[in-house]
C-alpha cells in the first residue's frame, strides 16, 4: 500500500491518517494533534494512540453549517461503515454500534468499550451538546 504523506518521521508524526465515510461523501486528513487552529483545517485526533494499537481513538471535528468536516455526522446510523487509513497506507474498517448526544464535559467517551474502537465527536447544531459516534473495528 502506498504511504499517504511524506516519508520523513517528522512529517509522518503530524498525521494520524485519513478518515473516509462514503455515506456522507467525507474524506479528510486527520491531524495527530488537537488544537483550535488545526480544527479549522481538518479533523484532529482528540485522544488515543495509533490506529494499529489497541484502544480507543477519538477524532474531533467542527460541525460547520456548510456540511464541511463533521457537519453531517448526525446522519450516520448503527451498522454504517467508517474507513480509516493510517500513515503507512493500512486500511481499517469500523462499524458504528452507538450514536448519542452528551455535554462537553462528559469524558466517558474516552473509555474503550471494544478492543479496537473509534469515537467521532462534534458539536450539535445548537452547539449545546456533542454528537458522539462509537464504532468497533471489523
PLM segments and residue spans:
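Solvent-exposed, non-transmembrane regions of membrane-associated and secreted proteins
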Residues: 1-138
Amino acid at each position: 500500500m502506498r504511504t499517504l504523506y511524506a516519508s520523513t518521521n517528522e512529517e509522518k508524526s503530524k498525521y494520524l491518517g485519513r478518515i473516509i465515510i462514503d455515506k456522507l461523501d467525507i474524506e479528510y486528513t486527520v491531524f495527530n494533534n488537537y488544537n483550535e487552529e488545526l480544527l479549522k483545517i481538518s479533523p484532529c485526533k482528540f485522544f488515543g494512540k495509533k490506529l494499529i494499537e489497541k484502544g480507543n481513538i477519538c477524532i474531533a471535528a467542527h460541525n460547520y453549517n456548510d456540511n464541511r468536516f463533521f457537519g453531517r455526522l448526525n446522519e450516520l446510523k448503527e451498522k454504517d461503515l467508517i474507513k480509516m487509513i493510517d500513515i503507512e497506507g493500512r486500511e481499517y474498517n469500523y462499524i458504528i454500534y452507538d450514536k448519542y448526544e452528551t455535554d462537553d464535559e462528559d469524558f466517558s467517551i474516552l473509555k474503550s468499550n471494544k478492543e479496537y474502537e473509534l469515537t467521532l465527536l462534534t458539536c450539535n447544531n445548537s452547539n449545546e451538546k456533542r454528537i458522539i459516534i462509537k464504532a468497533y473495528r471489523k
